[in-house]
Amino acid sequence: MENQLFNNNSVLAWLQYFTDNTDLDLEHVKILDITKKNKNLIPAVEAHRSVLVFTEAGHPDIFYRMYNAGLGECTVVYNEGSEPSGEIKRDKVANMIDRGINASAGMLVLNPSARSTIKFGMDNRSFASGSVKYVGSEIRSVILSKMQINEGKNICVISGESIAIEAAILDGEGDIIAVEYNSNDRNTLEDNVNQFGLNNVTIIDHVDEDTMKELAVPDVAMLVASASMEQEMECLLKINPNIEFVIYTLDFVVAASMPKICDKFGIKDPEIIQITVSKLTSKNTNNTQPAPWLITCKAGE
């Protein structure tokens, strides 16, 4: 078994320490070991009133990044050592932005303003500005729903920057592979990864067996239809013959051709739907967004 900095006994000892010194309700505490791969601290704190965080020494900007994400009013309960004993301290994240973690230990982060609902279909203003033109939040919600995201699912997103970010937030236990062919779009995606404090996103510049061979095997792939779509599908099917696809296109001709393309890869009965979103403006005019086609299908059936 892989050596762990925090095993079950040490986790239980820290839980006991905090329950003895605070009014911690174990029923509502989220346990997060960020010494393990791909653990996202900021989304966890945003979504839970109490997060017991286990971390190794270092992380010089951990509190600054939390503050920068709007979590400055959260309370951190901690001690100065690496053992669950001794004097307990409390401070606001906003007062800790100039310090890091001085010992491998547990700390309790309290967020009374934690949201009680899943952040699903985020407002486009939440994302970093840059070269990317983000899909509307309502349409993104449908795409994410079609992807059937759950904890631990590995996801590949091709040219869908905001989809990759929301998927990473929703799927904190899974690996997200984000493919961006354009260097400016990769930079914007990197800005978003840093802004949201995500550790489970790997950014690559194209899809082939070499770029994918060291990465997690994706369970589902979201693609924006392009000239390279069939090559992308072929590559992903070699990696996972049972992969699920969610494909986005504004082109009716592409949508109409998808049954034939899917049949070429042995994929039967793709579902093809069109989504239309209209908004009534303050001037009582109708603002209709572009109406994409979504194609969903699963290989190996």
Give, region by region, the residue ranges found by the protein language model:
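A contiguous loop/helix-start segment that scaffolds small-molecule binding in enzyme catalytic cores
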Residues: 48-130
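Core SAM-dependent methyltransferase catalytic element
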Residues: 106-113, 282-301
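Short beta-strand element of Class I
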Residues: 173-179, 245
